Amino acid sequence: VAMSGGTYSLLCPSVTNIKLTGTLSRGVAAKDVILEVLRILTVKGGVGKVMEYTGPGVKTLSVPERATIANMGAELGATTSVFPADENARAFMRAQGREQDYVEMLPAADATYDETIEIDLSSLTPLVALPHMPDNVRTVEETGEIKADQVCIGSCTNSSYLDMMRVAKILKGKTVHPDVSLVIAPGSRQVLGMLAKNGALNDMIQAGARVAETACGFCIGMGQSPRTNAVSLRTNNRNFFGRSGTKSAGIYLVSCETAAASALSGVLTDPRALDTDLTVDMPETFLYNDNLIIMPAEAGNDAEVVRGPNIQPFPQADALADTLTGKALLKMEDNITTDHIMPSDSKLLPFRSNIPKLSEYCLTPVDETFPARAKAAGGGFLIAGHNYGQGSSREHAALVPLYLKIRGVIAKSFARIHKDNLINNGILPLTFKDEADYDRFDVDDEIELADIRKLVAGGVTTVPVKNLTKGFACETELVLSPRQQGMILAGGLINKIKSEQ
């Protein structure tokens, strides 16, 4: 939309102040900070909110540490996470050769917030998120010495130069436990080059680590899938069921320090027990090389776009009909994630531009028969519990249901980002007014939304849903901004933009 000259809009979120005091103890990491926030707020606690980190503790955190914390704000369901652009940020940009781009951005002295949560960094201990949710958090100490079969260090959450150097310090001169497979994926070409230059990469290799390509890899099941029934300790941000590529595996989320210590011992280990000095001096100048960046052509509109057979057209949506009818194609429990809705693993990632192919796998982790039934029925409705669409902002989790002609999702509650994506694609997100009505629906019930176009156009927030099979009606809530009303009426954002040109 922005590329076509339009605007990016969202509902104004509330702001939660995460006030940090104290300083992290040795062996306690930024990952433990965000795991503590998840423990407090849960995976639903950030919906409709911006997380703003303030307080004297913020000054003790480097930019990579702040990035780790902000990265997992998505697991809270938050709109975004904010740290101040202060002198720490300026020093980081200077080291990257970009100080000229620095702009100071600090909270006003009299800033007020919708809520405040205080966390004393000095009181934190190493934490671990147990399977299969990032908010299933315990201390490493109380969890005990769980035997580890695999340790994976990296991902967009924990793969910075700072993270990698601490891992290298722990591994240097030691050997990975014989029962553990250790894989390390540095987070960028820059980080990998610096590790190779200073010898840290060799320390990892000599300890027994396998070095993986810088990529969206093991976190999403692209390689390193654990063996059957394995325990895998990982530094990524999500441990949803089956996401690793092995449904029977247990994925535990930990810091880099905990992961490296556990790789040596063979069991979940508190890194504070190590004698290693984990101090890392951030370089005054990072190794940066832009020689592989391909600059856009001056006449960009004249560039030829080559589409192979795996690049299929964008699914087309119809304008909202006067009345919608269809079967309840699937009934789901709470916390259905975007991984459930549209799995994304080594088998499916090559088809990200091929929605018809991806449709064959939509919601198959819940019910393998769903895609075939949805196509045979010509579309219909989905019934869901709380927090439907939890997880990332994966647009395919809305694009593929659009292709399957899903007309609406009736749920107890929605994850914010996914709800917005449904609206963007013309799919109605309806919330049960009385959660008990969820129990009255079953698969194959015939559903009708009478006069739905008239209701949406009139800004009506209470939408009656008729169950024609069982002969009852219940009330659902449909809260849309005027702009979102236009999107739903047009059949999605793209249709709306086209109609305005």
Model-derived features: where do they sit?
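Fe-S-dependent hydro-lyases/dehydratases of central metabolism
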Residues: 1-501
